[in-house]
A protein has these predicted regions:
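Conserved acetyl-CoA-binding loop-helix of GNAT-fold acetyltransferases
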Residues: 98-113, 134-139
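Acetyl-CoA-dependent GNAT
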Residues: 12-16, 34-95, 106-108, 112, ...
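Conserved GNAT acetyl-CoA-binding A-motif
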Residues: 114-125
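C-terminal "cap" of GNAT-fold acetyltransferases
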Residues: 86, 127-134, 150-178
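Helix-loop element at the rim of GNAT/NAT acetyltransferase active sites that forms part
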Residues: 23-38
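Conserved active-site tyrosine of GNAT-family acetyltransferases
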Residues: 137, 142, 164
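A short beta-loop-alpha structural element at the N-terminal edge
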Residues: 8-23
Length: 178
């Protein structure tokens, strides 16, 4: 994938990416579209990237070596009954939104989830007014499963989110008991 002739490279995030990730999460569009708080600390991101659990997978998208987006793919919970579930969250730097960065991150995350981790279900939450993100997730097979009313406090008021999920393409449910 390229943007203006420059390839988008997705790789594993490293602690050295903390400065760039802090810049991403300082952008007004990113703050408005995620559950992160404004004014993130570089040191907090450095620690988070250095200490993330083995079950978490952090990816970054780069253009010409510059980090312009990130995605976290996490276990769906500690319950053994949800080992088949992954949860994801992503962000793209404000000035790189709409340039294919989100699609590159999603392709890499789905390859990891489907081909290597064997997640059968991926979940995410997205603000109902984040139309570009909703369109991106739908493009990659996610469907809205419900509305979470007053799910998050954002910019002085409560905001709704959609719960979205995607089942692995080969997933089949057991037959319903009769």
């Amino acid at each position: 994938m390229t943007t203006t002739g420059h390839p988008i490279v997705v790789r594993r995030a490293e602690p050295r990416d903390a400065d760039a990730i802090q810049v991403i999460f300082s952008g007004p569009k990113v703050i408005a579209g995620t559950l992160q708080l404004p004014y993130p600390s570089v040191e907090a991101w450095r620690k988070r990237l250095a200490d993330f659990p083995a079950a978490d997978h952090w990816l970054v998208a780069t253009i010409d070596g510059e980090v312009v987006g990130n995605l976290g793919l996490h276990d769906g919970g500690k319950s053994p009954r949800r080992r088949h579930v992954g949860q994801l969250g992503m962000s793209v730097r404000d000035d790189r939104q709409g340039c294919g960065v989100g699609s590159a991150l999603m392709r890499a995350a789905l390859d990891l989830a489907d081909g290597w981790i064997n997640y059968q279900r991926l979940e995410l939450w997205v603000f109902t007014d984040n139309l570009a993100a909703i369109a991106l997730y739908r493009k990659f097979g996610f469907a809205i499963e419900g509305t979470c009313r007053a799910h998050a406090f954002r910019d002085g008021r409560y905001a709704d989110t959609y719960a979205m999920a995607r089942l692995h393409p080969s997933f089949t449910m057991a037959a319903e008991p009769q």
